[in-house]
Amino acid sequence: MDRNRLRHEVAQRFADVLKQDSRALSLLQLLADDAHAAGPADRAHWSGPFAALAEDAAHLRGIDAPQDSVGIWERDAATGDFVRAQRHVDLWRFCANVERIGKKGTRKRIAWLGESVARGFFFDPAYAPAQVLEQQLSALGEPVEVVDLAQSNCDPWWLAHVAASTPLLEADAVVVFAGNNWRLGELAGSAPEPYVVDGELIEAEHGFARILERQHRKLDALAAQVVGRLADVTIGAGIPLVLVVPEINVADWINCPAGTLDVPPLSAGDTQRWVDAYDDARRALDRQAYADAEERIRLAIALDGGTSSASLDLLGRALRGQGRRMDDAYRTLRQSRDVIDDTRIVPSVFANVADTIRRVGAERGAHIVDLPRVFAERTGDPLPGRRLFLDYCHHTAEGIRLATTATAQTLLPLLFERDAPFDALLAAAPSPEREQEGWAHLLAGIHNAHWGQEAELCSHHFREAGQAAPEIADDAIRQVYDAYRGRTTPSLVPAFDKLSANPIAETYLVGFGVLSRNAFREAPLLAALTDAFPALGEHSPDPDYTLGELATLDLLDAHWSDLKDRNRWYRRAYRAAYALASSFTFVAAAPRALSIALTCRIPDARHADRVALELNGQAIGAADVGSAWTSLRFEVPAHAVVHGINQLSIRWPNVPHDDRRAQLRRDFEAGARIDIRTHFAHLHHLTLSTAA
């Protein structure tokens, strides 16, 4: 085994260790405290995030510009061209499908860098922002070449590494459209000081709010460092730098998955009061009493200190409903997206990171394209949502065209000393073909469902897919339903082969999609598909796990766990409930009597209270449960069970809990991964069985 292959094997095994044990990363960081910057020979074998690992540990000190590569493309000594390297084959799917970057010709050359938004995620590889920008500039300026170096999953250190190579391309300008992946590691990091300070704050009143402030200050420093590095390697080399400040889906995206709450640990009475205030506000919002909802939810926010995405999101919706307070609604919804949570890593630019890009970029001489301002001005809507975004941060075709138009308007005077009206540049921006737009919405529907978004938003994207391209409604929608409804891994189902024959679908489903069907619950995805296309309801959404054909169903199996379930992040012998209701969907072959067995507890409850079960909205039993594990069994008559989809709900009591912050602090200071959200119940066992 040669040296590079050996290193690759070690890197792969080390990556597996990091995935299995978060403390291994902290150990690595401790060992790297005195690390020196690696030279080109030392880092040549790394790829993607690993390519930046030495730079990360060394904090970008003394990194020399690479002499023989631009991202995944390496110089061909015979021709001088940059050729896609075989050793980076694992990254090809994240980059432009370009085999060779030739020598610069007579046209002006722009290097286009960024993350998945800059790649045109959901449209990739058929419709790319770099292609749109090239056509716009060529139409109203002179013929140009835009070299697409954008890479999905690109971290800030790898971005700086690629930017440092742009002088090799003789670029006339560099555009960096990034910021959504600029984030920190786990809570403490590597140094002892954060363990002491953060540990004290975990136990303090409103300590989590102060921890969040500390994390945001660290993000400020990170963003300033990255922007400074980008300016050093571009402006420092005499190349104009354009920084595109990203925007996110403020109106429609929710960071806290539907049906859950992210309540930080509070005192016993405060947790109870928080839940009461939240429930009151939710009911007021449902009846469109927006001012009342605002008043109620502010009580909850006063208790959590602004560290709950759920409470901030509800406040933002209440402000939005009042109509006259859109600026307040924007700031509040934006704040809800910026709550840092290790178990909910949503690619999106933090508001303070965007501010730092603007400020430091301008100070260093970069030209700023401010997409939040552009989107608000061009759409007349201060709350960008599904019109411009397909998920948390990736754009619709309109969003792409507006972003590249603003970028082109900035580049024209830099490259050609001329200006052009925004509308003229927008008119020159090509649109995707209707089939491409349909596929983008179809994949977005899958993605939103997997990320715990509300059913209405997922159904919206599926309907948009069918309207954009009716042939998708005829074939691809059914293929998605068939691929994801069975026990078999989707990639082994014939329908999946048909889906991935489309290049857009292949890029997402094979490159990014979750392929293991049995690993998590697909009921929300299948329900959203059926809502958009009711004819699908004729087919069972769970043919391999049907009660009646199987004698027993274990509802705590991964098959009934959402992809974004926080429980997946922790090694424990129970499933925690993060809301006062836990819902489970199952399919029954026919109405017949069944038995429900469960073992549960209300952790740290001061006293026992009523746990109630409902099946399809009908009460089927209740019992008192406290802090001790309690085993229960309920017999359900046949008339309560329906043929097809059934909904089991368990409602947990809102009782006072002992304050667990002192224990969390001890666990944290001992190096354990701690769960900083309130558990309303623990489930150790939950099965359904047909009556004997």
Give the positions of each predicted feature.
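Extracellular carbohydrate recognition and processing domains
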Residues: 620-640
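Noncatalytic modules at the cell exterior or secretory-pathway interfaces
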Residues: 638-651
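N-terminal secretory targeting modules
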Residues: 1-110, 123-124, 138, 142, ...
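Long, contiguous interaction/recruitment modules in multidomain scaffold/adaptor proteins
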Residues: 169, 173-272, 353-433, 490-491, ...
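Short, surface-exposed beta-strand/strand-loop-strand elements in extracellular ectodomains
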Residues: 608-618
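Membrane-embedded segments
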Residues: 104-170
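A short beta-strand element within beta-rich, extracytoplasmic domains
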Residues: 590-605, 609
